[in-house]
Amino acid sequence: MILENSDKLKDWLSVVLEPLCDADSSALARYVIALLKKDKSDKDLKRIMIEQLDVFLSEETTRFVERLFDAIASEEYLTVPAAPLITASSASTAELTVDQELALVIDGPQDDIEAVLVADSPPPPPKDNVIKPDSNQVKLEQASQDAREAEALAFISQEAGIAMHVPTDAKPAFDHKTKDSHNQQSASNYQHHHVRSASPPGRSSGVSGSGGGGPGGAGLAAGYADKENQPRDSRRRRASLRSRSRSRSRSNERAFRRSRSRDRRVNEREKTQRQFRNKSPPGSQTDNRHHGRRNFDRRRIGGNADDRPRFGNNKSRRSHSRSMSPERNARRNQNSPDRVQTAQANLIPAPVAPPAPVEHPASHPRQRCRDFDEKGYCVRGETCPWDHGVNPVVFEGINNTSLMMSMREYNPDAPEIWARSGGPPPGAGQGPVPPPTQPGQTTINPFSGNVRPTTLMSGSGPSPMGVPNPADYARNPGAPPQAAMMPFPFNPTAVTTPLQRQLIPIPVVDGAPTGGVAEVGKRRFELEDTVAIADVPTKRKVPINSRLGPRVNPNMQQHNSSLELRKVPRGLNTIAHLNNHFAKFGKIVNIQVSYEGDPEAAIVTFSTHAEANVAYRSTEAVLNNRFIKVFWHNDSSGADVGQMNQMGGGGGGGGRKNASQYHLHNVPAVPTPNADGAKISNANPLTEAGAGNIGTPATEQANTAAPASMRLKLNTTTAGGSAGGAAGAGAPGSGRPLNPAANAASIRKKQEEQQKAVHQLANGLRKRKQELLQSYMKQMKTALELVERMDQQDPQRAPTLQTIKVLQMTIDKLRKEIKADQDQLQAQMQQQQQQQQPPVKKTKEQQKKELLDMELELIAQQQEGNDTTAIQKRLEELQRNLGVGSAANNKSTHYAPASGAPGGGAGRKRPNLPEGPTRVDRRPKAIVVTGFAAEEADFVLGHFKNFGEISKHDVDREIPQLILSYATRLNAEQAVLRGKMYKDKRLQISWAPVVTPAPAPMAAPVEKSAAPGDMSVSLENPKQLIQSVSESESLLGSDTLPELRLEDEEEDEESEDRSWRR
């Protein structure tokens, strides 16, 4: 749809939509214009707009859309400003009717109409000079107006009662979201007639910080109002209307009116108490029992200059209020947290306006939290003394040290910290303010902890604790003013240190005879800079059950700069993690992980003892893990075992070294990058353990300078030799007896783990070299192809040839390195096997079981077609050790009696024979291949030549079929397993039947064929051969070889005499 003037239509829509919904009328108007601009017909636009606007307007949607299209068609929005659309709500209609009839019935001065109506009307002009009317003049005006108002009062009371019963979901006639002038007028009217206070008009007009009347006060109150207070404000306005209407009634209604006002105040006080449940109450409402009513009245003292009395004189109004005397009023102003007290306030009872208040942002009457209102959250959470409302935000990162309040734990040695806490806190209202201190004394801000001198303000006494200090605002301008009701003090010396944990330092009593317990308790443990704790006298041991554990003579650790870590998680026990944590304490000269072969131990060495001592005494969890234990590392190899003590709570961790038990709250800070850099080494732990101590920094730097390959070789070649040294050094250093068998088992386990790690590293390097070699080969192949395509005179030919030469040299070098690595690894493995302890003598039953397992493994490997040479050698070795003959020899004794010895005897004499292949493999080596075309016979033959040497082949092109005889059984097995697929065609392969010669009287068939029929089929008769092959296809297929092997092994088991069957 094409619109003539979008701006005027938007203004018209804003006015129409404002009473219809709670959404922003201007934003909704823009949305409606965007819908209107769609290229649709009127019918489609109406349907779309009804669907889209239903969520905003609900039952008024259809009516609004019809009116909108009528206005667009008649161009009404261009000429006539739209009146708000009257809703169908009965409550709104009732309230509009009340306002209109009130305007028609009340025939009196504009002031009286203004006091009654809550409809939209311009606010009265403010008056600069407020003149307090005489009491007699007020009585005359009252008498002259009674006749005119008598008839209207009953109607006003009745209609006001109807307005009070409007449902909560109905839209009131006055919406606080509309304009600032409405807010000003409603706040002004509300404050004029709802509050009956003894405060003079001049003072009430001058105080703008209470957020009541006047343009400034109303705007401030509107800015700080939140959604939780909106329903309450609506109820207050309706209650104000009812209160004003009844304020003109006769004197016999005053007792009832007072009771109703009292009930409202009690309800407001209970609502305020419920609002601050489970939260810290604001400072001005600490004692709600005594001052809830006064605070209720004082919050509503407006700043409108038109605050003159209208009905009754001052005396009658003062009699009905719960106000205080001028002296108590001045005292309350003195304790108020959002006003500066003056000396004249408690001396002059006349209604003199106080000086302008100090302008700091948080002067809201409800003591709202400024951070919560402006930022949406407050980092103090439930510890904040200011109001967060009924739905506070829970800040999950409250334990973050960078967000916590700048305060430390309670310090009992702070001077005069409890001086002001003996009586009731200032501002509590339970007694007079404590006498002012001397000018030379100091006061402590209860929140920031600042120590500030007491000064006189405007010639009066010192500011109480609750009054904000401008110095505090200069220091922290974003914080709200301090609360008056904070009886707990803080350490004034801990302003700059973030609070980490509430750890209470426990002093250690001196062992010297002159040191008293009281003096030790007074002494504070300060941070040491460069002085070691060697100057501290010798401490006596505390009881054994103390949580601090026994003390250690600090003279032992005065030159120690190494810390030992235990129970470090394996994922965190790395040089990078440890360096990131300990670099903040000083310069690190060495980090050793997996100390003594323990993957959960580490050694961190600092450049000086002072740095190591600061790291040791830090209360911060190492790597954010409380289970990690930190001990002083003992350089001696067990010489001072008698002087070592175990640390309490060490978790059974062997040789734990003690240190000073001072508590030091180190400030976590970003570590400064070290100019020299940390010299870190990862030397061989077993080698250093064999020496019994950690290497010196020079030695460790030398180890760092060594190449990685040398360190790897050192780790692998000296693992076995240093194992005994590690065991010898570990036993005295641990301070506890070890079982020799358990110690040997643990050392062997550590050696195996280290060997696995070395092998994995070597395999990774070898794999990387192989990949590099393959990439070089590809590059060289590409270069050769490029050279072949080039002409002889091509200028690029010479550089390409040079590149090929370089690649060839690199490939040769890589091959040599790979071969050298393999030889080195093989030599290391042989050396480790030689260094291993001799195996325990196995019993005969164990040897038989192992022989059986090995034979089963041999059968399984043969079924899979894998190389079984190593397994056969191991099987033969086991048979020689057990004294039995091999399966092949047992079979040969049956087939060849000319050997002249029974199977058992031959087996026992076997170790005297020369080693080598002494048996004949008589298994079938010929296969029959079918399933191809006759013209493909030659190609199929070439295909099977890839699997080994073919000694004989026979081609029958009529069937067609191919009979192949391989030189070895292994080649035939490979052909059966891997030669089934040929050019996406599956060939059918089976073992050819074996032709046996004329049977001798004592001889038996060598092997049983896989075919189920007669085995006397001759190779010269191919038809019978094909028929036997077709009969055995069901058994052969893809699993031909394993099944044949199983049958062969079953025949072997039946024909030979096994050792375990005896």
Swiss-Prot record:
One of its GO terms (cellular component) is nucleus. The lineage of its organism: Eukaryota, Metazoa, Ecdysozoa, Arthropoda, Hexapoda. Residues 1046-1056 have a biased composition (Acidic residues). It comes from Drosophila melanogaster. Residues 423-438 have a biased composition (Pro residues). Residues 172-182, 264-273, 294-310 have a biased composition (Basic and acidic residues). Residues 7-75 form the PWI domain. The gene is swm. One of its GO terms (molecular function) is zinc ion binding. Residues 234-249 have a biased composition (Basic residues). Residues 197-207, 823-840 have a biased composition (Low complexity). Negatively regulates Hedgehog (hh) protein signal in wing development. Regulates neural-specific glycosylation by binding to FucTA mRNA and facilitating its nuclear export in neural cells. Residues 134-145, 322-340, 444-461, 1018-1037 have a biased composition (Polar residues). This is Zinc finger protein swm.
